[in-house]
């Protein structure tokens, strides 16, 4: 048996495949046959409540999924993660984002050294800097305080900070303005700074290597913009730029005082870094105490994931359900539906976390898989999505499992708003599960010709995740829940969720193309005929504009 077939050849996988072939139950049947199902098929930990009763599962299904987790060595993989073993095999690194939120006094050893004190040294430096900026004691080059913060990064250096800022805006200092620049499209930078005063603006340049093309292009443009505001005075850079990086030489060359460089480690992957120094903009927005509360939330979920039995382990259950639909029901996507406007960027954040992690086609030992890996994650906040894509989920031909996320207590209690919002959460999950039969439609006097259009098949599965209130701590728990669900999936699929070689080829080709686009002479093109034609067309139109 080849390495790639170890999964599909294991007994639990075969049993699940047989179980799926015999599956003929509708969610209506499952609830009718088990009056206590809605209370029984739930799990609760660290302040998060998961209702997974509206899924295609019986006790037998759960038993087989849990057996799959055991047979594929999930327990050992979890321990290897937390022990700091080099589980990122292709880069020969640990993947120790859990160390970023480990409390002081704990120990996680990498290459013979406890890294937790290093983590807290950086956090303490971040906190001291945040206090200076937030209090107004950090002065810009003109002597004015900082009123605007612009985070420049891309990928994990942008998606996490943007999501966290939006999610925790309720807790932010509203006297500070925050902007985020990631796209190399000049519009992104131009719009971010068009109404800002250079004398009151601080740039955070977030790039581990300080060589990332998009980030350093935007950083150079920001530097030029700042110097224009200070009539070319190079000394201004040190008071208006800080770096999140590990490349001291490049940071200094840029003009940033290396005392204002906040580092992190090669065992922190970009999409797992929002709770590292990459979260400096988050700390500036919400303050050090709230940031530490967020870290405490992450850590609480870490402990739960590591210690809870799989049958009540929230990330494990969610990961197993994803595998059940992805690999046995051919469901290609997961809809993430937060009924909380502050979480409007959460689905976009999860897109990188899930698909960059598990969008892999070979196993850890380099063998091509013979099963599907990561589904596509997407979504929008409710109730907005109800008036756009929910139609397809309810009555379309695709099976789309959904994650509903909601909070019992509103941050803005305005009249009936929150009750109406929560009514929609519960109603949508119910409608997806149970639908509306032809008999129910016709009993209401609907004409026969119209009745089929009003039938809802139902049998659309969903999870509902409830928490008391959206707080920094709750956000940490929620992000860690999905981090560990992703890890659970990767362990069972036997893939590496911590590398991202798929982003490299386009970068390499882009370097070649930019040389051809900017050449003063007509370049000799060696691409395919389509790419060659587009390059020539672009060059021709650009020449007309010059």
From Swiss-Prot:
GO molecular-function terms, A-Z: carbohydrate derivative binding; glucose-6-phosphate isomerase activity; monosaccharide binding
Protein name, entry field: Glucose-6-phosphate isomerase
Catalytic activity line of the entry: alpha-D-glucose 6-phosphate = beta-D-fructose 6-phosphate
Enzyme Commission numbers on file: 5.3.1.9
Similarity field: Belongs to the GPI family.
Active site: 356, 387, 507
This protein's GO CC annotations: cytosol
Species, as recorded: Syntrophus aciditrophicus (strain SB)
InterPro entries per the UniProt record, alphabetical: G6P_Isomerase, G6P_Isomerase_C, Phosphoglucose_isomerase_CS, SIS_dom_sf, SIS_PGI_1, SIS_PGI_2
SUPFAM superfamilies attached to this UniProt entry: SIS domain
GO aspect biological process, one term: glucose 6-phosphate metabolic process
Keywords: Cytoplasm, Gluconeogenesis, Glycolysis, Isomerase
Highest taxon listed in the record's lineage: Bacteria
Class of the enzyme per the UniProt entry, highest EC level: isomerase
Pathway the protein acts in: Carbohydrate biosynthesis; gluconeogenesis; Carbohydrate degradation; glycolysis; D-glyceraldehyde 3-phosphate and glycerone phosphate from D-glucose: step 2/4
Annotated PROSITE patterns: P_GLUCOSE_ISOMERASE_1, P_GLUCOSE_ISOMERASE_2, P_GLUCOSE_ISOMERASE_3
Compartments it resides in: Cytoplasm
Function (record text): Catalyzes the reversible isomerization of glucose-6-phosphate to fructose-6-phosphate.
């Amino acid at each position: 048996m080849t390495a790639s077939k170890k999964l599909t050849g294991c007994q639990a996988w075969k049993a699940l495949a047989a179980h799926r072939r015999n599956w003929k139950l509708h969610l209506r049947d499952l609830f009718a046959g088990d009056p206590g199902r809605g209370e029984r098929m739930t799990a609760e930990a660290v302040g998060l409540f998961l209702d997974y009763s509206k899924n295609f599962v019986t006790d037998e299904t759960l038993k087989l999924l849990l057996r799959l987790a055991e047979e594929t060595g999930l327990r050992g993989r979890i321990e290897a993660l937390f022990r700091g073993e080099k589980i990122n095999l292709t880069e020969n690194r640990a993947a120790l984002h859990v160390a970023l939120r480990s409390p002081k006094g704990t120990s996680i050893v990498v290459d013979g050294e406890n890294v937790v004190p290093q983590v807290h040294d950086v956090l303490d430096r971040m906190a001291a800097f945040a206090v200076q900026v937030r209090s107004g004691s950090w002065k810009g080059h003109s002597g004015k305080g900082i009123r605007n913060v612009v985070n420049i990064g891309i990928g994990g250096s942008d998606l996490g900070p943007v999501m966290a800022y939006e999610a925790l805006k309720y807790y932010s200092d509203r006297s500070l303005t925050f902007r985020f620049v990631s796209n190399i499209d000049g519009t992104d930078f131009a719009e971010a700074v068009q109404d800002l005063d250079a004398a009151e603006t601080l740039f955070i340049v977030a790039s581990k290597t300080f060589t990332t093309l998009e980030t350093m292009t935007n950083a150079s443009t920001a530097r030029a913009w700042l110097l224009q505001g200070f009539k070319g005075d190079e000394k201004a850079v040190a008071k208006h730029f800080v770096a999140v990086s590990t490349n001291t030489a490049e940071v200094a060359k840029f003009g940033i005082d290396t005392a204002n460089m906040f580092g992190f480690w090669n065992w922190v992957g970009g999409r797992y870094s929002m709770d590292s120094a990459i979260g400096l903009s988050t700390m500036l927005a919400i303050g050090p105490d709230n940031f530490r509360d967020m870290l405490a939330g992450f850590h609480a979920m870490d402990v739960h994931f590591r210690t809870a039995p799989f049958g009540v382990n929230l990330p494990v259950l969610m990961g197993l359900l994803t595998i059940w639909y992805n690999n046995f029901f051919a469901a290609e996507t997961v809809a993430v539906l937060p009924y909380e406007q502050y979480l409007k960027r959460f689905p976009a954040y999860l897109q990188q976390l899930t698909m960059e992690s598990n969008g892999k086609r070979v196993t850890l030992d380099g063998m091509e898989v013979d099963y599907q890996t990561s589904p596509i994650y997407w979504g929008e906040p409710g109730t907005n999505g109800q008036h756009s894509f929910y139609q397809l989920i309810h009555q379309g031909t695709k099976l789309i499992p959904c994650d509903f996320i909601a909070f019992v207590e509103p941050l803005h209690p305005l009249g009936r708003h929150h009750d109406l919002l929560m009514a929609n959460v519960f109603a949508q999950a119910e409608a997806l599960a149970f639908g509306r039969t032809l008999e129910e439609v016709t009993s209401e006097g609907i004409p026969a010709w119209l009745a089929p259009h009003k039938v809802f098949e139902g049998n659309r599965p969903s999870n509902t995740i409830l928490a008391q209130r959206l707080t920094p701590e709750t956000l940490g728990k929620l992000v860690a829940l999905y981090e560990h669900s992703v890890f659970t999936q990767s362990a069972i699929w036997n893939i590496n969720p911590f590398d991202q070689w798929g982003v490299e080829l386009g970068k390499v080709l882009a370097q070649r193309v930019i040389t051809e686009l900017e050449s003063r002479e007509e370049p000799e093109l060696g691409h395919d005929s389509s790419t060659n034609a587009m390059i020539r067309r672009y060059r021709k139109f650009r020449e007309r504009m010059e």
